[in-house]
Amino acid sequence: MNTQIIAIANQKGGVGKTTTCANLGIGLAQAGKKVLLIDGDPQGSLTISLGNPQPDKLPFTLSDAMGKILMDQPIRPGEGILHHAEGVDLMPADIQLSGMEVSLVNAMSRETILRQYLDTLKGQYSHILIDCQPSLGMLTVNALAAANRIIIPVQAEYLPAKGLEQLLSTVNKVKRQINPKLQIDGILLTMVDSRTNFAKEISALLRETYGSKIKVFSTEIPHSVRAKEISAEGKSIFAHDPGGKVAEGYRNLTKEVLKLEKQREKNRRCFSH
């Protein structure tokens, strides 16, 4: 099984990374894919939003898995992986992950510890999605070093030029120095309030500024109060409000992501002949 590893990254917080990771992951599972979600944020937002309100009480989290890799200790198959009712698996995170980030600084091959952990799981999943923390620290670099694709959620409230430039330069650096396979799938506009002209302007501006270099997904995720409520319930938007606009947005995003995959696979085959 050729595992697709997708990092959901933006060093700005509050742009819909966690919501996108959970709902795209569950969308892919509904499309028949075998999906593992990785919570790469010490705050544990993804872990909490998938129904684990106290991540610190979990017996095994991502920091334990990375710790075992650092110490060269074996990891049991499936160790610490949780199963969600909507068909995805989860490797949770808790606050210990911030301590792990500190210990990575002096570790040998510090950028690839997460990649080495994911290598132990690769044949078991068609897709692994990583919810990155809102910073460009060592954990995010680990996620970019492990991924072959990246999706960048951007809130449609203002032009994120500076932050985006910073993120893109980090992506290019990782691609050059550590992970030549890394490709940007696209920029995803989130929390779009279609009633305002402002969101339309930002959308047009983003497409104008980056569209020639980077795909901007044609799917836009609408702003919704209900989407905010669900993270407390441990369910996806598909379970909470299947007929709503946000669920439709994530269904369309899932289709776009799969279409992109097919296209790349086709191109790869053409090149290899």
Where do the language-model regions lie?
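P-loop NTP-binding core
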Residues: M1-H273
